[in-house]
A protein has these predicted regions:
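Acidic donor-binding loop of glycosyltransferase active sites
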Residues: 269-281, 294-295
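Membrane-proximal helix-turn-helix segments that form the acceptor-binding/catalytic region
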Residues: 129-162, 170
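Nucleotide-activated donor-binding/catalytic signature segment of Leloir-type glycosyltransferases, i.e.
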Residues: 243-266
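Carbohydrate-associated surface elements
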Residues: 168, 187
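Conserved donor-binding/catalytic core segment of Leloir-type glycosyltransferases
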Residues: 196-216, 222-228, 233-234
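Short glycine/serine-rich donor-binding loops of glycosyltransferases
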Residues: 283-287, 304
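Active-site donor-binding segments of glycosyltransferases and PAPS-dependent sulfotransferases
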Residues: 26-98
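Short hydrophobic beta-strand element within catalytic cores of glycosyltransferases
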Residues: 295-298, 305-308
Length: 340
């Protein structure tokens, strides 16, 4: 049986790439495809030396670095991949990978990390954050997203079996595509994030860790700690928002930028609690924190509702608020005080 694995774009190692790594481990002889491949040489270990077959976008100027600017061309690009020689196609999709063309004698399984939120429920937020609420460019962007929604919904019908990474995403698939999906949670290496030796939890700080991008809502956490000057927050992660976050942060917030997993794990083991404000599709990092025995304070929406056990005194906030801080928390070892 010939197997093809199709991923949206290869530019970094995040949750979707961890899933891809496990799919490739299950099918070591599979051929790998992606819209573009721009993973740095020192981060390609998860590909296990595989050649990546890309689309015509790989050859366009600036496409590997500014691949998101070519979103309007990606449906066309993904449809140009010739997969007719394969029996099984597995797409790992949060954008366009599920749109590959397949025939009646081929089986197409698609692991959906999320439908394209920037084209659906987050369109207005994304346009606002990009400064595209008004003007000619705004209308061009809205037209492009409109076309993308039509294509996205149509191509969902070409998938034989949809797989969601959480019940939350299965609900979104049901809403957008009007199809049912099997839930298979992403892999989390909980053994690597086991609790430290007794007495490890000696830190006087709270921790958050993620890419510094708007939807992770690190800004909300920073603003919350601005109102808690006696509590220290450590932020791990790099991204385009990091400079702006540093400029608005109070003295009790420390930014460490990108750190290797060994450093992240050490901070997780020592933190009083892990703080998480994103509405994530699944949310791997809160699971890693809990594997370290660290309490989690989380915004009570998204995949975190399937991985974090709420305290009895949970604040059931329907929206994010610095003043209320509504969320969910789990307090392993009975340390309820760390999640209040």
């Amino acid at each position: 049986m010939k197997v093809a694995v199709v991923h949206d774009w290869l530019t970094q190692i995040a949750g979707a790439e961890r899933v891809l790594e496990q799919i490739l481990a299950i099918y070591p002889e599979a051929t790998l495809f992606a819209v573009v491949d721009a993973v740095a040489p020192d981060q390609r270990g998860f590909l296990a030396g595989r050649e990546v077959h890309t689309t015509f976008l790989q050859k366009l100027p600036f496409a590997r670095r500014h691949y998101r600017h070519f979103l309007g061309l990606m449906p066309l690009a993904i449809e140009q991949l010739d997969l007719s020689a394969f029996d099984l196609i597995i797409s790992s999709s949060h954008a366009v990978a599920k749109g590959v063309l397949t025939g009646p004698d081929q089986l197409h399984l698609s692991y959906i990390h999320s439908p394209m939120r920037y084209a659906w429920d987050l369109q207005h937020q994304c346009l606002r954050e990009s400064g595209l609420e008004r003007g000619v460019l705004s209308w061009l962007a809205r037209w492009q997203l409109h076309r993308l929604r039509i294509w996205d919904q149509r191509t969902a019908n070409g998938v034989d079996h949809l797989i969601a990474n959480s019940g939350f995403i299965a609900g979104r698939i049901r809403k957008i595509y009007r199809r049912e999906a099997t839930v298979i949670y992403p892999p989390v290496d909980v053994d690597a994030f086991a609790p430290g030796a007794p007495g490890t939890r000696s830190g006087d700080f709270y921790l958050t860790a993620s890419r510094a991008v708007p939807h992770k809502r690190i800004d909300l956490i920073v603003d919350a700690f601005a109102q808690l000057p006696t509590r220290r927050l450590v932020v791990i992660g790099d991204g385009p928002e990091l400079k702006r976050l540093r400029q608005r942060a109070p003295a009790n917030v420390e930014f460490l930028g990108y750190q290797p997993v060994t450093v992240l794990r050490d901070y997780m083991r020592r933190a009083r609690a892990f703080v998480f404000a994103a509405e994530e599709d699944f949310g791997i990092v809160p699971v890693e924190a809990q594997a370290c025995g660290t309490p989690v304070i989380a915004f009570g929406k998204g995949g975190v509702r399937e991985t974090v056990i709420p305290l009895e005194a949970e604040l059931a906030a329907a929206s994010r608020s610095v003043a209320v801080g509504g969320g969910r928390g789990v307090a392993p070892r009975g340390d309820a005080g760390a999640a209040t």
